[in-house]
């Protein structure tokens, strides 16, 4: 094992630069691998339903990168975001295009009128089924890909054993019921558990600081012994591995 002092300095360096622009994980590209073979294609599903005259809202758009990739007519496009650095980014990139962007961090109070949208999309963001029902036109669709409650749990246990699940109800069975009770018809519902692997501890440190809600209270100082154990595993096995949890819901009002 490398000198512990040097490792700690290296990991603290990763910790200090754990900031992202939009939702950009390029800093650890090649140093980790996340299962991309999800058995559905979120973008293709959206395009299946999207017509040029449809009014679409991307709630919790991040930096707007995915929304812009759809190339939907800007006059029929709206977006919200609540994370301050991303809000500023959206103001700089989306508003000049004519996209109806509004700052919003409360999924139960979205600042648009009743029945404003034909399609609402949301990837890995918050949502409130009753509020979505209010915002959608009759026959309108909500399409979401979500991170489930079991996401990265093995990795959390490696460094913060005993940490409670932050959102225990985020799974397909419970959320499908929530949407049905809110008056939606479920058109598609799928769930997937896929591997995530880290090839160096520094990449994991950066990741854990970015995904701070999954790793509450994590720091190199606090978890140093656990990180050393992770380092040993990587030296012996070439990686540390966990599991991602994703689910998809397409619901019609």
Locations of the language-model features?
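N-terminal, positively charged/glycine-rich alpha-helical extensions of SAM-dependent methyltransferases
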Residues: 1-27, 36
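Conserved alpha-helix/loop element of class I SAM-dependent methyltransferases that forms part
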Residues: 22-25, 33-55, 65-69
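Class I SAM-dependent methyltransferase SAM/SAH-binding core
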Residues: 55-109
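A short acidic, Gly/Pro-enriched loop at the edge of an enzyme's catalytic core
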Residues: 109-119
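A short glycine-rich, Lys/Arg-flanked "PGG" loop and its adjoining helix->strand segment in the class I
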Residues: 127-143
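Short, glycine-/aromatic-enriched active-site segment of Class I SAM-dependent methyltransferases
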Residues: 148-166
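Acceptor-substrate binding/catalytic loop of class I
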Residues: 160-174, 215-217
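Conserved Class I S-adenosyl-L-methionine
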Residues: 185-253
């Amino acid at each position: 094992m490398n000198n512990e002092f040097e490792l700690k300095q290296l990991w603290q360096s990763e910790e200090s630069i754990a900031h992202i622009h939009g939702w950009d994980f390029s800093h650890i590209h090649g140093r980790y691998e996340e299962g991309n073979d999800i058995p559905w294609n979120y973008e293709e599903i959206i395009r299946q339903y999207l017509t040029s005259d449809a009014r679409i809202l991307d709630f919790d758009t991040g930096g707007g990168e995915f929304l812009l990739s759809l190339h939907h007519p800007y006059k029929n496009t709206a977006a919200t975001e609540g994370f301050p650095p991303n809000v500023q980014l959206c103001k700089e990139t989306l508003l000049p295009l004519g996209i109806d962007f509004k700052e919003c961090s409360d999924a139960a109070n979205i600042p648009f009128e009743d029945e404003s949208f034909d399609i609402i999309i949301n990837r890995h963001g918050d949502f409130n089924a009753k509020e979505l029902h209010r915002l959608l036109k009759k026959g309108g669709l909500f399409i979401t890909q979500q991170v489930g409650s079991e996401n990265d749990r093995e990795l959390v246990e490696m460094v913060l054993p005993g940490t409670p699940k932050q959102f225990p109800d985020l799974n397909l069975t419970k959320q499908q019921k929530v949407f049905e009770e809110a008056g939606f018809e479920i058109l598609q519902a799928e769930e997937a558990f896929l591997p995530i692997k880290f090839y160096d501890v520094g990449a994991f440190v950066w990741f854990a600081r970015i995904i701070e809600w999954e790793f509450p209270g994590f720091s190199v100082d606090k978890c140093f012994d656990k990180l050393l154990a992770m380092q040993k595993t990587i030296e012996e096995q070439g990686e540390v591995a966990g599991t991602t949890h994703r689910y998809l819901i397409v619901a019609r009002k």
